[in-house]
Amino acid sequence: MIRNYTEEQLEANYNKFIEAIKKVFSGERLEKLLHMYSPEELGTELAIAPASGKLNFHSCYVGGYIDHVMNVARNAYKIKKMFEDGGGIVNFTDEELFFAAFHHDLGKLGDGAEPYYIPEQSEWHMKNKKSYFALNPKLQYFDVTDRAFWLLNQYGVKYTQKEQLGIHMADGLYNEATKKYWISYDENFQLKTNLPL
């Protein structure tokens, strides 16, 4: 589904996201996140970025990024509760869960100077591939996850091992780089947290 947000709706969604950040995090970590997401830093891109470039993927529209990460956070919490209610052992905090959910696609906000996605210019790609946003060729190539960690480091935002695993493994087995975490027959190399599950 494509949404056509007005400028006022984009601003309201941005403010909702900032309020969610304030509700979950505190202290120095909150200060650094608020700085990172301020309009002078990544905030404008946060408000307008799509979550994907193709129509058949998730939230491929201006403002889709916030919709996507808020949906991931909401659903991750529901799944955690269901897991817990079913007798599962939760060995991570709600803050760790929300940190991973809110930041798993952070790399899609670009590098602070350039956006990750730009409007697709090719009519052929829009018509035949349903590609409405293209990757910005001005950016140094990074995997989305690698750029997410780079951005967090640029802004001095610390994260736990569980948060790093949660972000790193957000795409599950669809990302070749994470298979070594998911598929291990040696007990010493198996996950010691269930946050990414």
Describe each model-derived feature in a short phrase.
Residues 1-50:
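Non-catalytic interface/linker regions that flank or bridge core catalytic/transmembrane domains
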Residues 10-13, 65, 69:
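Generic structural signal for well-ordered, non-membrane alpha-helical segments
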Residues 53-63, 67, 74, 79, ...:
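Divalent metal-dependent catalytic cores for phosphoryl transfer on phosphate-bearing substrates
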